[in-house]
Regions:
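N-terminal hydrophobic/helix-forming segments and targeting peptides
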Residues: 1-354
């Protein structure tokens, strides 16, 4: 992957966007989408919607969510220690010792999530996950007044982890769930823009907000866009590391290619068109059977208005909802290519009735 594109992914990661506070990353996305689309707008919830060939049919929505996990400052004690609420689904055991950035109007403040040292834990506390009430953020001050000069109640914070390269095609960062998905859909739009003379469908890009707290942005944006077809891009678990079971979650691997979901939330014709596009492009893929809900924006998009023909493409990801999520740039590139080829195959005669 070109370094300039990796740099754009880095910009997405560097723009904090806890659920409900996505404005900074959405500004980065708006600026990028002006290069590849004919129209751009932001709705009342903060979803960024950008259209390429907007008057054509069928209308297809390509979406990923831009929000990430985060923290919300709730209280500062007399010694300047900061207590917080979590935004999204954290495993509390991953938090003690984590460095965080508290984002303020004057800039970011570095802090550390503190907890009583292991040496001081009582016997009944050892081996148990810590409670949020037993943790705080330490920014290195001595008094409440010092902390208040730097941090306001209601400030947001994110883990301080940034994008770094691992071996081969792998990268590690916080918030790859789902900024890697946003990046993938932007890449697909960039490729479609470069081939717009072949494009017959109207394509609506959506960078959706508030997925981590209830799939909210996808719910409202799908109603507004009113697509016939929608494909969401998110991350999914892998079974290629210790303490996971292929029997429970299937055989999903990093560098194994796009993960294509099948199940009750997935339109069977859209599923087959994604398979066909992958086969024609020579892209290896992985199948993820979803017996009930997918836990992604697909679930609410499917039942928008009179119904939407939905598909779900997933990026294999290790260690979800930690500060060290791992994905493959190769998988991302292949999903972007698959998505663009899928869209180019759509026309006014496309039938999605099961």
């Amino acid at each position: 992957m070109e370094e300039s594109r990796i740099a754009f992914l880095q910009r997405l990661i560097n723009s904090p966007s806890p659920s409900g506070f996505e404005q900074r990353v959405q500004q980065v996305i708006r600026e990028e989408m002006q290069l590849y689309t004919d129209e751009q707008r932001t709705d009342v919830h903060g979803n960024v919607i950008a259209a390429l060939n907007p008057n054509a049919n069928p209308r297809v929505m390509l979406t990923a969510h831009c929000d990430e996990l985060g923290f919300l400052v709730r209280f500062i004690d007399e010694k300047g220690f900061i207590y917080f609420a979590t935004i999204g689904g954290f495993d509390p055991s991953t938090l003690p010792g984590e460095r965080v950035q508290i984002h303020t109007a004057k800039g970011s403040i570095l802090g550390v999530i503190g907890r009583k040292p292991v040496h001081l834990l009582q016997s009944d506390e050892r081996g148990k996950a810590p409670k949020l009430s037993e943790m705080w953020i330490d920014i290195g001050v001595n008094h409440k007044e010092e902390a208040q000069e730097l941090v306001a109640i209601g400030s947001i914070a994110t883990r301080a982890a940034q994008l770094e390269k691992l071996h081969g095609d792998l990268v590690v960062s916080r918030a790859l769930d789902d900024k890697s998905g946003v990046f993938t859909v932007v890449e697909a739009m960039r490729r479609l823009h470069g081939q717009r003379e072949k494009l017959k469908a109207g394509v609506f890009f959506v960078s959706a907000v508030q997925e981590e707290v209830g799939l909210r942005g996808a719910h409202t944006s799908a109603f507004g866009v009113d697509p016939l077809i929608a494909v969401a891009v998110d991350v999914t678990f892998t079974s290629d590391h210790p303490q996971t079971s292929k029997h429970e979650i299937g055989d999903i691997r990093l560098n194994g290619g796009p993960v294509i979901s099948i199940g009750g939330r997935i339109n069977p014709r859209v599923y087959q068109m994604l398979i066909d596009a992958a086969d024609e492009a020579g892209i290896a893929y992985q199948i993820d059977p979803q017996a009930s809900g997918t836990g992604t924006d697909t679930d609410v998009i499917q039942v928008s208005r009179a119904g939407v023909a939905t598909g779900l493409l997933s990026i294999p990801c290790r260690y979800l909802h930690t500060g060290s999520e791992i994905v493959s740039l190769k998988d991302i590139d292949e999903i972007a290519e698959l998505l663009s080829r899928f869209v180019l195959a759509l026309d006014a005669q496309t039938n999605v009735i099961p």
